[in-house]
Amino acid sequence: MNVMYAWFHIYRPIGPDPCPELALTPEQQVEVRKFVVEMRSRKPIVIIDAYHDGEGNALCPAATGFTHHISPWGDIEPCPIIQFANESIHDERPLRQVFNESEFLRDFRETAAQHTRGCIVLERADLLHDLAERHGARDTTARNAAYQELENLDLRPSQYNPGHEVREKNLVYRWAKKFWFNDYGAYTKHFDASNWVDSREAPIEQSNVPELHQIEQ
């Protein structure tokens, strides 16, 4: 079909109508990870994910400093689903300098890495709210309701699921991630397991939808 790559994301319930019942359980997230790893070893297509290193350890690309997000209006945000910013591409400083000197982005990376190897939006929206408020970060949404939406979020499990790591089978992916997609020392430097709030047992009322169909392998 001339498809060169596919990108797998796990749903993050956020926004004006977050639909938390659609959030995946820890078990479902492990199955998604297993599927991606298996397909990488069997199919002639590049499959991209954003949640694990080559050994299967969970990570957040924004917390590691691997990537941040630029909104349609030019706001420099920590992540596509974290719509707060103090800087813009329209600032006079070069983009590289903005990324390196932003106190908001640096504090975000450290705060996220200190508390979880997963998604701070799902696990600790309260910390994110306090962080943005402390820095006076702008709400970059058109609806101007991001702060309130964070307050309304329920605790949800994310990709950090200790004891259920799934290592890459494909040596090419494992090698590539070793050099180009890892935690860059962020968790070694900052993560403290005693700070982590285990959200895996959080009650999840999933929607009454037909049973999901298994993707043919």
Stretches with model-predicted labels:
Residues 22-23, 28-31, 57-65, 73, ...:
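Short alpha-helical interface elements
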Residues 1-59, 63, 72, 77, ...:
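Radical SAM enzyme [4Fe-4S]-AdoMet core and its adjacent flexible, acidic
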Residues 81-217:
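Flexible mid-to-C-terminal extensions adjoining Fe-S/redox cofactors in radical SAM and related proteins
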